[in-house]
């Protein structure tokens, strides 16, 4: 049986992003984001209700301050009492898991979308995704960028403006571009 492009995307395989089913999911997420981002002056409780409508899993007390941007939403799982400040971006072609009690500063970008090295595959519109896992009680400073396939361990700290290109051990403090373990 042949897999659909969406099934390939969700399995982390090479897929064609121009596929009509995938494009329909992008449009649906765009409509949800338009409504969510118009709730800027609403309460955290109202935001939480909207998040449960548009994201895959939302733990109790989780907050994402608008404006917020993502590709699909259904690949995002945010734990209990996790907090994400405004202007964050999650490119969620693969699963993004944010653990309980994690705090994410403004303008953080989390990418799961990746592209093949082969220029012909890129020109054909092929891409793939690699999941990002962020543990419990992690602090990610404003403007940090988390690249595809990265796992950040529980209780880790990522400095503002850091570019995280590889896994971060539990309890580690990383900063810089590329991010490196510091003191």
Curated annotation (Swiss-Prot):
Q: Which Pfam families match?
A: Hexapep (PF00132), Mac (PF12464)
| GO MF term (any one) | O-acyltransferase activity
Cite the EC number.
2.3.1.-
Top-rank lineage group of the source organism: Bacteria
Q: Name one GO cellular component term.
A: cytosol
The UniProt keywords, alphabetically, are:
Acyltransferase, Nodulation, Plasmid, Repeat, Transferase
What does this protein do, in the record's words? Answer: Acetyltransferase implicated in the O-acetylation of Nod factors.
Q: Which protein family is named in the record?
A: Belongs to the transferase hexapeptide repeat family.
Cross-referenced PANTHER family: ACETYLTRANSFERASE C18B11.09C-RELATED (PTHR23416:SF23), SIALIC ACID SYNTHASE-RELATED (PTHR23416)
* Protein name per Swiss-Prot or TrEMBL: Nodulation protein L
Organism per entry: Rhizobium meliloti (strain 1021) (Ensifer meliloti)
């Amino acid at each position: 049986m042949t897999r659909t492009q969406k099934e390939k995307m969700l399995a982390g395989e090479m897929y064609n992003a121009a596929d009509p089913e995938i494009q329909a999911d992008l449009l649906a997420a765009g409509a949800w984001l338009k409504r969510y981002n118009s709730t800027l002056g609403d309460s955290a409780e109202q935001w939480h209700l909207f998040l449960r409508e548009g994201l895959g899993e939302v733990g109790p007390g989780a907050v994402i301050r608008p404006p917020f941007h993502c590709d699909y939403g259904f690949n995002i799982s945010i734990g209990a009492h996790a907090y994400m400040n405004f202007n964050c971006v999650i490119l969620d072609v693969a699963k993004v898991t944010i653990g309980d009690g994690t705090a994410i500063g403004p303008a953080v970008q989390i990418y799961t979308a990746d592209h093949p090295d082969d220029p012909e595959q890129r020109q054909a519109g092929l891409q793939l995704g690699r999941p990002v896992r962020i543990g419990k009680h992690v602090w990610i400073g404003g403007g940090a960028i988390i690249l595809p396939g990265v796992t950040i361990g529980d209780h880790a700290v990522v400095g503002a403006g850091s570019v995280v290109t590889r896994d971060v051990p539990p309890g580690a403090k990383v900063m810089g571009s590329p991010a490196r373990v510091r003191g």
